[in-house]
A protein has these predicted regions:
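N-terminal signal peptide c-region/cleavage motif recognized by signal peptidases
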Residues: 18-21
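Bacterial N-terminal signal peptides that target proteins for export
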Residues: 1-9
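Bacterial N-terminal signal peptides
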Residues: 8-16
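Catalytic glycan-binding domains that act on GlcNAc-containing polysaccharides
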Residues: 24-157
Length: 157
């Protein structure tokens, strides 16, 4: 029995060190750089940083190089639709972690001013048809809100 414990103990220790070294303090698996930008722009725009993190997890799985349907980067920003916003904010590289989150947070802020309701804001951001008139949350909005709440709990909020 003691021999078995001696054999498995180093493996268990190695696994626990590996799993803790890759975990982010926020509970999110996105990069530390992205988390810092979420906090920075969350504070600047009055948006919950954990919601930004949840959106990044959902939109791009935390990968800054992702492109889908013309939308690019962590928050899946369309440089076609947000060209003026990018210029106004001084963002020249939509794949830049900080720049992408800056554009996404600025757009969300605009949507919050227009719609006020977080569910509608998320559905409009996601490009859902008739989002402003829906009476129920979409699966996308529900997932973001649920994950955001989980991240907030992990951060002691």
């Amino acid at each position: 029995m003691r021999t078995t414990i001696k054999l498995f103990l180093p493996i268990i220790i190695a696994l626990s060190i590996t799993s803790t070294s890759t975990a982010q303090p926020s509970g999110s698996f996105i990069s530390e750089e992205a988390q810092e930008s979420c906090v920075k722009y969350g504070e600047e725009y009055g948006i919950c940083p954990e919601m930004l993190m949840a959106m990044i997890e959902k939109e791009s799985s935390g990968r800054p190089d992702v492109e889908s349907g013309g939308c690019k980067g962590l928050m899946q920003i369309s440089d076609r639709w947000h060209k003026d916003r990018m210029e106004r904010l001084g963002v020249t590289d939509i794949y830049s972690v900080d720049g992408n989150i800056h554009v996404g947070a600025d757009y969300l802020s605009e949507l919050f001013e227009k719609y006020c309701d977080v569910g509608i804001v998320l559905m409009v951001y996601h490009g859902e048809k008739n989002a402003a008139t829906k009476t129920e949350l979409s699966d996308y909005a529900d997932w973001i809100l649920t994950r955001s709440a989980e991240l907030e709990r992990m951060n002691g909020k």
